[in-house]
Regions:
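Extended amphipathic alpha-helical interaction segments
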Residues: 82-170
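Aliphatic-rich, non-membrane protein domains
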Residues: 2-5, 9-17, 62-67, 115-125, ...
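Alpha-helix capping and helix-coil boundary motifs
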Residues: 35-46, 65-66, 87, 138-141, ...
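Arginine residue identity/basic-tract feature
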Residues: 8, 16, 32, 54-55, ...
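N-terminal Sec/ER secretory leader and immediately downstream segment
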Residues: 1-99
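A cross-kingdom marker for long, charged
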Residues: 158-214
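Acidic-enriched, low-complexity/disordered segments with a strong bias for Aspartate over Glutamate
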Residues: 3, 18, 41, 65, ...
């Protein structure tokens, strides 16, 4: 029954096709947890396992076609906006802890929030699948690439002081949660607004690394 329910989801269809043994093991464990506990316990278990699988396959995701990387960035931004609509604290916890954040785990099974969380995870595993089949080698972003990104951020109202704060982990940690959440949304919006495809590709390769590997 759990397998039937999960196969209505694009994410779980992808995982069953690409990681059949992992899928079977975790579906069986999810069924056991639900019978002995709660849906919240099952969600926590699945998130933990998904994060572990994502980290193991990070290099495959980063080797995907650029269209897949753009999709990851778009889905990450959509998820940030969704979580921010719940609260700045939830958005901030996601930025710091990823899907393993207790706040995110709590929202994962909830309508209105779970869809965006799942879509972001699904986008990463679509990239993993693509990168495993047809890996792409990429070069690192250059200073001139980051100058292009800074110009896009300036269009969004960023000052030089904002750029310095965002580049300084200590300063960012002292910034209001709501502003940090907005800045990270701007960061991804700016990447997606870059018109030079080669520049955008190099920057996404750098920016998405902590998203898929962290």
């Amino acid at each position: 029954m759990i397998d039937e329910n999960f196969q209505r989801s694009q994410l779980w269809q992808q995982l069953k096709a690409d990681f059949p043994e992992w899928y079977q093991t975790n579906i069986e464990e999810a069924a056991r947890i639900v019978s002995a506990g709660t849906e919240a316990d099952m969600s926590k278990h699945l998130i933990v396992q998904l994060v572990e699988l994502r980290r193991k396959n990070a290099e495959h995701a980063l080797a995907a076609d650029t269209s897949k990387l753009i999709n990851v960035a778009q889905s990450f931004l959509a998820n940030l906006k969704s979580l921010a609509s719940h609260s700045a604290a939830t958005c901030y916890s996601f930025i710091g802890q990823g899907e393993s954040s207790p706040a995110v785990i709590e929202l994962f099974p909830q309508r209105g929030y779970g869809e965006a969380i799942e879509a972001q995870i699904a986008a990463i595993f679509e990239a993993v699948s693509d990168g495993r089949k047809s890996p792409v080698s990429r070069v690192r972003a250059t200073k001139s690439d980051y100058d292009v990104l800074a110009a896009e951020l300036t269009k969004l109202g960023w000052s030089k002081a904002d750029l310095r704060v965002f580049a300084d982990p200590k300063a960012l940690a002292q910034t209001e949660h709501e502003k940090v959440c907005k800045m990270v949304q701007d960061w991804f919006s700016a990447h997606l607004a870059i018109s030079d495809a080669a520049v955008q590709e190099r920057l996404l390769f750098e920016t998405l690394r902590p998203i898929v590997a962290g």
